[in-house]
């Protein structure tokens, strides 16, 4: 079995204009990503503001991306919730629309234990019969998929990968010891740790910053064996990432997707936009980064 993808998958931001999904901007953004060597597109995840998208919007966004991508790279749909059976329904619908895989966040608020996590994920996987990427992001859910649990879940034929947003390399190493790395992929959920993640054997990243610098971020993966080269290449990206840490994702990255012309600079409540001075700071950091690349 081969991995779902190797390298950079983009956690796609949802463009808005006047608080409506801007499908024209969405199509142009996806085409930009496809033209710049992206290996997968993840829709309806954290960066997409999925909690404030209606089911109809999620389905239409997914259908738009699936049609445009036309099997050139995997399209992965975020369908996980803290309701197992709603997650099944959303995943089945994503499969019908044409998603190549689903990404499932850990249940939140109605937290469970590790035994409950195993049953939750396996129930969805066995019912939907589509490749599943587990999504571990304890900073948002206050729930961790323990390494032993990942190991158990990795034996399910439909559960094929983990998006690890812990930024904890002890956790990464423990997970890696418990999986068959030829069949189960490990993707970083943190743009700022990708160099180290690749050096320790990670298979790629589900990236926020690749919304705006897809080719540059894929280069880091392509050159991962050249430690000196990618360490130096990553330094200006780190500076841009610092500017993108002014607020929670996706508030800062949408400054730049709007700057590139993909929708207006809008987020949906309860998220609020950056202040004007902060927006200029993010734009200036991006301009300096691009100037340095020329």
UniProtKB/Swiss-Prot annotation:
Residues the entry annotates as binding pyruvate: 47, 206
Keyword Cytoplasm appears in the UniProt entry: yes
GO biological process, alphabetically ordered: diaminopimelate biosynthetic process; lysine biosynthetic process via diaminopimelate
Enzyme class: lyase
Site (Part of a proton relay during catalysis): 46, 109
GO molecular function, one term: 4-hydroxy-tetrahydrodipicolinate synthase activity
Subcellular location per the Swiss-Prot or TrEMBL entry: Cytoplasm
EC code: 4.3.3.7
Pfam families: DHDPS
Cellular component terms (Gene Ontology): cytosol
SUPFAM superfamilies tied to this protein: Aldolase
Main location: cytoplasm
Pathway: Amino-acid biosynthesis; L-lysine biosynthesis via DAP pathway; (S)-tetrahydrodipicolinate from L-aspartate: step 3/4
Residues at the active site: 135, 163
Family indicated by similarity: Belongs to the DapA family.
Quaternary organization: Homodimer.
Main function: Catalyzes the condensation of (S)-aspartate-beta-semialdehyde [(S)-ASA] and pyruvate to 4-hydroxy-tetrahydrodipicolinate (HTPA).
Protein name (Swiss-Prot/TrEMBL): 4-hydroxy-tetrahydrodipicolinate synthase
Organism field: Staphylococcus epidermidis (strain ATCC 12228 / FDA PCI 1200)
